[in-house]
Amino acid sequence: MSDSGEPKPSQQEEPLPQPAAQETQSQQVCTFFKKPTKSKNIRKRTIDADEEDGDSKSESSILQNLKKVAKPDSKLYFSSGPSKSSTTTSGAPERSVFHYDSSKEIQVQNDSGATATLETETDFNQDARAIRERVLKKADEALKGNKKKASDEKLYKGIHGYTDHKAGFRREQTISSEKAGGSHGPLRASAHIRVSARFDYQPDICKDYKETGYCGYGDSCKFLHDRGDYKPGWQIEKEWEEAEKVRKRNKAMGVEDEDDEADKDSDEDENALPFACFICREPFVDPVVTKCKHYFCEHCALKHHTKNKKCFVCNQPTMGIFNAAHEIKKRMAEERSKAEQGL
């Protein structure tokens, strides 16, 4: 009876044999040749998904259109969408590590580029003029009798380092005295330049030189450097038309014209003319006038010119030029005609 009361081991509790356990372990570790299951249901929903759907029914649902953002696989990557990813749900924008911002002010130099230098030419301490200055300096030192060291006699100082033995027998002891000879290469270009290029409707006169007295082109400017007053054709015609309008309006209103006033001024000028020769103090006989506007008799002027080549009144050179005084001749003719009418 005791044998029947003992519990019998079941088949489930029996331990597996050792080779079978090794086969299962090898199947779990080595999965290189495991074949995929073809009858896998992709659209099958899991239990967790069902539970999440049940919870979402009680809460407010939010629909989001999640798009897969293409990642740049190569350098030739173009995108028409925004630069930031559309899948980000956080409202705060991403901030870059470095942020640059300008002051939004125009950078204007105080000197307007007046102190700018031209750096395209050779440096002034390496050009031909500097080399020539060093040669003259060495020649001057040798001429003064500075003793040389023994090591300096065997030291090669380049093609420009030879002693100038003719330094004491010529006048060109300074670089400024021989700059026009061209013995030290081309002249130094101006380091401070201000280029100006401005043209107006009148292309034959340099506008910069006329207004400011300065031209960036200098002597090479192809336009005329003159600061005189010139009027173009359209301005002359405009002034003439305005003067004609004023003259016609004054004529219609019965106002005296400016020409009449000019005639009065000319009469006053005639009254200012001398009535006698400055030399003989008598009425004019064949009156003449010099370049300095002084009136003499013809024979008095020639007689004085033989002794003195200068004017009798102002002592300016007459250059032997005596023109006919038509104003005095005209006045003398008018006086003669009035005298004849009075008789």
Swiss-Prot record:
Pfam families reported in the protein's UniProt record: zf-C3HC4_3, zf-CCCH
PROSITE patterns from the UniProt entry: ZF_C3H1 (PS50103), ZF_RING_1 (PS00518), ZF_RING_2 (PS50089)
Keyword DNA-binding: yes
Sections of the chain in a coiled coil: none
Residue intervals of every RING-type zinc finger in the record: 277-315
Entry keyword Transferase: no
Zn finger (C3H1-type) start-end: 200-228
GO molecular function: DNA binding; zinc ion binding
SUPFAM superfamilies: CCCH zinc finger, RING/U-box
Region (Disordered): 1-102, 249-268
Biased composition (Acidic residues): 255-268
Bias (Basic residues): 35-44
InterPro entries xref list: CWC24-like, Znf_CCCH, Znf_CCCH_sf, Znf_RING, Znf_RING/FYVE/PHD, Znf_RING_CS
Biased composition (Low complexity): 7-25, 79-91
UniProt keyword terms in alphabetical order: DNA-binding, Metal-binding, Zinc, Zinc-finger
Name of the protein described by the UniProt record: Zinc finger CCCH domain-containing protein 1
Taxonomic source organism: Arabidopsis thaliana
